[in-house]
Amino acid sequence: DKDEVWSAKPVIYLYPEEDEDETCDAKPVAYLYPQTETEITVRLDYDGELTCTYPAYADGWTVSARPDGTLTDKNGQTYRYLYWEGVSETEYDFSAGFCVPGSGTAEFLEDALSKLGLNRAEANEFIIYWLPRMQENAYNLIAFQQEAYTESARLTITPEPDTLIRVFMAFRPLTAPVEIAPQALTAPARTGFTAVEWGGAECR
């Protein structure tokens, strides 16, 4: 069904939808960068159904995190980030955003993700995942979500990070350009223990 919202499911590293449509929160990944090696617990309060987590979520994730972002679980397994995917009925906000030609997606995302606070490695992983789903479209209507996402997917991180950056992109493929008010993109300075999350949803 072309009206369904979907996402591919690999590996936390709008026009109003019809009521019967689902929204897939695609590949939210979370990175943890403490100042010293620290045991950290991450819990997710999600207004929807989790469909996949890695490592296994259970009642939360507890890992030992290093300043370089390496995460180690109780069994000694290491991870680059925490991953989850879920399905919800969240209505994303497309009152402001960007209409971007598919051919200009990579350049747009490089600039936007930097303004939103992702470092080069994080932005690279974001772009590698999303670019194949966007560059062949004639245009993409893109809006980076604030409360619509953060209020439906609430994170509790213990100990609490000094800096929390959450980047969530909703986009809709278009066959022709549309006018939309531009969105202001800002980010806090990355100081102290920093936690970063990125994800997205493709809306059809």
For each feature predicted by the language model, list its residue ranges.
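Protease-labile, long low-complexity intrinsically disordered regions enriched in Pro/Ser/Thr
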Residues: 1-204
